[in-house]
From Swiss-Prot:
It comes from Orf virus (strain NZ7). This is Vascular endothelial growth factor homolog. CDD domains: PDGF. Homodimer; disulfide-linked. Its main location: secreted. Belongs to the PDGF/VEGF growth factor family. It is found in: Secreted. One of its GO terms (biological process) is positive regulation of mast cell chemotaxis.
């Protein structure tokens, strides 16, 4: 019985040594530090982050088109603001292009005349700078480049 308990302790120590950063960070023996707080604040703050956006929502007027992939990853503002009356909002944006496969159904006089699929570059808005602003403040608008 002692051998089994000893082996369990040894295995636990080996696992902990292999994952040393996780074992140390989960320890509550040391008091919280300003550096810990700053890391937490930085991780949760208002800033551009990788965000998955659905192309159908980016181009709602294109109901006869299907995109593949259906979604892409771009930077969008997200995070926590200190005040309850504030929201993390884009203050600078830019258009970026992504290449997708677009399938469209063309119709003539109400009848389906064909399905076509081709690769296209389309424009998606990406946030480059974020700020916490009052909820009543208007957000900047970005003009969308025409699709090619």
């Amino acid at each position: 019985m002692k051998l089994t308990a000893t082996l369990q302790v040894v295995v636990a120590l080996l696992i902990c040594m292999y994952n040393l950063p996780e074992c140390v960070s989960q320890s509550n023996d040391s008091p919280p530090s300003t550096n810990d707080w700053m890391r937490t604040l930085d991780k949760s703050g208002c800033k551009p982050r990788d965000t998955v956006v659905y192309l159908g929502e980016e181009y709602p007027e294109s109901t006869n088109l299907q995109y593949n992939p259906r979604c892409v990853t771009v930077k969008r503002c997200s995070g926590c603001c200190n005040g309850d009356g504030q929201i993390c909002t884009a203050v600078e944006t830019r258009n970026t292009t992504v290449t997708v496969s677009v399938t469209g159904v063309s119709s003539s006089s109400g009848t389906n005349s064909g399905v076509s699929t081709n690769l296209q570059r389309i424009s998606v808005t990406e946030h480059t700078k974020c700020d916490c602003i009052g909820r009543t403040t208007t957000t900047p608008t970005t003009t969308r480049e025409p699709r090619r």
